[in-house]
Amino acid sequence: MHSRSCLPPLLLLLLVLLGSGVQGCPSGCQCNQPQTVFCTARQGTTVPRDVPPDTVGLYIFENGITTLDVGCFAGLPGLQLLDLSQNQITSLPGGIFQPLVNLSNLDLTANKLHEISNETFRGLRRLERLYLGKNRIRHIQPGAFDALDRLLELKLPDNELRVLPPLHLPRLLLLDLSHNSIPALEAGILDTANVEALRLAGLGLRQLDEGLFGRLLNLHDLDVSDNQLEHMPSVIQGLRGLTRLRLAGNTRIAQIRPEDLAGLTALQELDVSNLSLQALPSDLSSLFPRLRLLAAARNPFNCLCPLSWFGPWVRENHVVLASPEETRCHFPPKNAGRLLLDLDYADFGCPVTTTTATVPTIRSTIREPTLSTSSQAPTWPSLTEPTTQASTVLSTAPPTMRPAPQPQDCPASICLNGGSCRLGARHHWECLCPEGFIGLYCESPVEQGMKPSSIPDTPRPPPLLPLSIEPVSPTSLRVKLQRYLQGNTVQLRSLRLTYRNLSGPDKRLVTLRLPASLAEYTVTQLRPNATYSICVTPLGAGRTPEGEEACGEANTSQAVRSNHAPVTQAREGNLPLLIAPALAAVLLAVLAAAGAAYCVRRARATSTAQDKGQVGPGTGPLELEGVKAPLEPGSKATEGGGEALSGGPECEVPLMGYPGPSLQGVLPAKHYI
């Protein structure tokens, strides 16, 4: 009796344990990591149905999905990351993501979406990152993103937008609208007070409205490259906290005046490449005392004496010049094509100058200079009753350039919410945040119950070393990835590799996703003799934030011409050499055909005349010469040959098969003879 009463509970417990273990991985997917499902390159038009309910990360990119059925995400309340990129999705039903109450990352890049409605992202109260780039979005309803009050990143590049609705996103840190067709942005359209990075490249902007950036007090990274700006926008002067400014590709800008960029003392990276500049302001040191990266390639520089300061300034201030091999002189003719950094002072054609040096005569004792522990240059004490004496020196050497003093004060209002600014060990400012706030600029409040991993720590880790890139062939570059295999304490999900051609007209960014286990990767299908910028970003597992982006530049080698050159090369340089033999062969073939036809007709006439003299068909002169031999294996000919060759086009058949040595390789291709 006792054993019978215990049997049903034991069976019930066994069934429960087996039921929990049967919960497997969806077909065509991988579940190697806990609470993570990878369905990469799975061929299916719908979302897999049998996803475990405790899944935190679901990756179903490049699956061929065309539609999202209502209820396809039901039963996944703990899902935090959903990757639906590189599919064929054309529309999103209203409320399709509403069951995903804990979703924080949604990637819909590279689909075929046309519209975003007010109901598309309903219920996603915890969403922090939304990627909608490389779609066909033409219309976004006003208020489509208003409910996403926790959104930190919104990416809409490479779409077909013509009008942008007002955006009210108080916590947004990154907004990417690049490569749409939005020729104008009205003032007040961006209600994003905390945005740090704003990318407006390739919109077709002709000007920037004066009030466009009025509320963006936290803006540090501005990209307005590849637009149609005709002059430096004056609205940029008010962005005192700007550290990175990209103006490349605005080919109508022909001049930069010092007052155009006045007040940007915090600027560290400036990109003015591919403009129409013939010179640069000589007081860049005072304008940008913290500048460490300058891109000025593909400008028609006039390398005369007013530009002689550039090379010494770059070297003395340790400024990194991006793409120095493309920063060349266009004028005057003697310097055309030369690298700007390779020119000496005398190469700029500066006249022999008479320099008046002021030599102070000191009556009092000169004390030793006071050395400061800061990065500022040593200062000399004031001198007592100095008198000056002028001495004239004839010199052709460049004027001595004093290094720019390092500023000791931080930009105004750079730290938010009461944070204090200070200079770090490398003379880069950093913010000390008060209790209750966090972030690089103290921009994010620490909320109760919020995980610290969702907000970047302060200060940020030091940037990675530059990438190691080496050329493999004229169309490929090899990127070394060993750094992500050795000594990495963060569990990596994958690597994101992006590259773009800096030399050609198409500068669109190409994005690849690589496994984290690769030691190196070869980027193929590149253009020869071109400069490429390649960046790699490690992607952490789960909710771990992205690592620092490591970038580098490399050149593909020159294409080598050989005896086995492809057809595309022969079209450019060797086209006449190929046409001349072909024309000669055609001419010889025509002459040979005409001569043979003439002989056949004359022989036929002779044979007709001899028929009256009882001469048999087998003893004709054409048969003795062997002209009729090719007719036997060819088309059906009569024994006499006279009927088959009389009149009509049949007489041309033996000419096509005539075994002439000079025309053997040409005649088969000439079917029109």
Swiss-Prot record:
Q: How is it modified after translation?
A: N-glycosylated.
Listed Polar residues bias regions: 370-389
Ranges that cross the membrane: 577-597
**Segments on the Cytoplasmic side according to the record's topology features:** 598-673
LRRCT domain boundaries: 299-352
What cystine linkages occur within this chain?
C410-C421, C415-C431, C433-C442
**Domain EGF-like as annotated: residue spans:** 406-443
| UniProt main location, coarse | membrane
Cell compartment(s), UniProt:
Membrane
Molecular function (GO) terms for this protein are: transforming growth factor beta binding
* Induction data: Upon retinoic acid-induced differentiation of smooth muscle cells in vitro.
Q: Which residues are glycosylated?
A: N102, N118, N274, N501, N529, N555
Keywords, A to Z, come to: Disulfide bond, EGF-like domain, Glycoprotein, Leucine-rich repeat, Membrane, Repeat, Signal, Transmembrane, Transmembrane helix
* Fibronectin type-III domain ranges (all copies): 463-559
Record domain LRRNT: where: 25-53
User: Which PANTHER family does its entry note?
Assistant: ANTIGEN BSP, PUTATIVE-RELATED (PTHR24369), VASORIN (PTHR24369:SF160)
State the name under which the record lists this protein.
Answer: Vasorin
Its source organism is: Mus musculus
Taxonomic classification = Eukaryota, Metazoa, Chordata, Craniata, Vertebrata
The gene it comes from is: Vasn
